[in-house]
Amino acid sequence: MLYSKDGYSWKDLDTVLLRPAIGSQKVMRDPSMVQGPDGVFHLVWTSSWRGDKGFGYASSKDLIHWSEQRFIPVMEKEPTTVNVWAPELFYDDEANQYIIIWASCIPGRFERGIEEDSNNHRMYVTTTKDFINFSPTRLFLDPAFSVIDAVIVKRASKDYILVLKDNTRPERDIKVAFSDSPLGPWKNVSKAFTDSYTEGPSVVKLKNEWLIYYDAYRKKIYDASSTKDFIHFESATNKVKVPEAHKHGTIIRVKEKVLKQLLAEYKP
């Protein structure tokens, strides 16, 4: 876990907060976290590269003590599902529910295009109010190309942005789409605002601009772009400072006391 006082310069707690205990491969990739109105932090993650029909889940009140990990089988009714990648949490404060989106590949379900059937992803969604009962899984986004790593951003009521990775060759880059609802439909998918071979976006609002972090995996850096309108983008590479070997995370704001407790517990 990293922490920052300004959203640009980051420091490493240099400790393991949680070790994966569920999933067929027991990995913990692509973590996404939100804090609910009751103060509880909810965390989801990719639990296996391939084979699993769901993702991992755990919760915490302080980011130090964690609940028992659970496996959420969101694609269990689709037996040919290849994978469940990068579940992303969004708290819808108008509907008072959590939205979870992720990328899955179901061979033969969509036009193959230039991708192999086992890499032809679309985004799916479920909603929950309590992380016990979940709405039926449904298609969230089909932009007519393989898409992964999507993130919902709220600018205002009826004004939402979806930051997404075009996972087709030779793209492998990040784009945006627009909607008046966090559940879509999404329209006007943009041209890429990053170079190719980028993925895992995370978005944070900082004063008069939005900062979009992403993994530039060919460059082997955690890169960033800035925007004020999600139409015009500028490189923020020289604005940010991220410790090496970090990628595809989530940025959330926490109260000062939460950070102080973490620093006292782990003493970086």
Annotated model-derived regions:
Residues 1-268:
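Carbohydrate-active catalytic/glycan-binding domains of CAZyme proteins
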